[in-house]
Amino acid sequence: MTAIVNAYIHIGFVEQISALCSDLLNKGYKKPLLLCDNVGGCAKVSRMKAVDTYGASPVSGLCGAAHLCRETSLPNVVFTDAGGTSFDVGVITDGSITHYDLYPTIDRWRTQVTAIKITSIGAGGGSVAWLNPLLGNRLEVGPASAGAMPGPACYDLGGEHATVTDADVVLGYINPDYFLGGKMRLNKEKAVKSLRELGKKTGWDEVTTALMIKKVIDAKMGQEIFKEVALKGYEPSEFTVFAGGGAGPTHCCGLASAAEMKRIIVPPISAVAGAYGASTLDIVHTYEKSRNTRLFDYAKGTYFTDFEMFNSIVNELRELAIRDVILEGFREDQATFRLELEMRYGMQWRYTPVESPLLFIHSTEDVKRVCDRFTEEFSRMYSAEAAFPQGGIEIETYRLFVYLNLPHFPITVHEVMGESSPKQALKGQRDMFWEKLNGFKRTDVYQWDMLRAGNVIEGPAIIEADNTTVVIEPGWTSTMTQQLYGILSHNI
């Protein structure tokens, strides 16, 4: 099925990439064109299969988030990207991305293209609010989206349905005169009209309807975050939310609260997290081979001893990798390798991907180290009580990653100067609705690019940037780091 899916999307892929290459060449670009893939790397167009690019944008965003969070010593982060239509979630643990989807579904088709695990749901700024008649006219938000055209009602491009963005405008969070840095004016009256129309059957006015939309979408996104972290065996409260996407910073406090998380990171590249992430990628190729290998026999109490067989499989994959490294124009000594093994206890149907501590094995002690790494990872995910050593320990798939480092822009570190007051960035005030404060309150509005390292902003407050709006709800505090990231903390 993987080959069929790849063949089906290959034609459109080639047409678009060929047009892009021609356009770049005509504009004087002479260097190779690199494309992002769904395993967190990039490669030349000539070395890329169409199916390997599926979902590459959110994967790039996740990789960019991991890069930024390592700079701020935040090891456990849940990456989120709330755009106009979808809400993407990925998990970073100990500063690394280790969770993969071994059989990702493309449209309705199950494929065998290993990809970094990203979960997406229909939730974003363009998500349409509606009343579900099957549930007594209960308010639902999404998965349908107004898209960019006609978009939310406030875009004034023909859209009539109330969306999350319309709710944010009516609640005062988004300034209609400063959307996209003032490049696009929003029509608040159209937003009010759409919300009133939606609230007719429930008896809500436009403000109540807007508040209910916010609560539903925040809960929906927060539940998805909680589920993704908890089902991987982690404690959600130990994670920091990375608020990405144009709508992410606007709803970050609400969704973090719903996910029981008390810290958020909002970098200045939030709205373009995927594009930024692409600039942080190195060239990565993946090679794999299925071969059942029993590493530990519980009944006999013996470990695997055919070291030559194990090493020959790894060597076979390594030779393929070196071939591609040379074809990419690099030397063999510029490449680094990482071996991942899909392992399980005997008679289990589910495999656990484990990073091998060794590329090759030469002794029983080496085999034991690999088995111990599997036991450690399995116990972390499912608890030690779920371990089943009586079934023995097996490898089903060998997967080799090869990395070629590319130059990247360094992250600028600013000196903390002066007092923590952000008064130099205060641009005004406007009325905003805060449920915890029981209504509309006059609220400070700050300009993002005027903030300095060390500035502290107590909620409620708003930080406006050209491509997003950061909503700091009551009970939250934002502190600007030396990298000029906003770190929002919940005041307990």
Feature annotation, model-predicted:
Residues 45, 49-56, 60-172, 253-295:
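Glycine-rich phosphate-binding loop of actin/hexokinase-like ATP-binding domains
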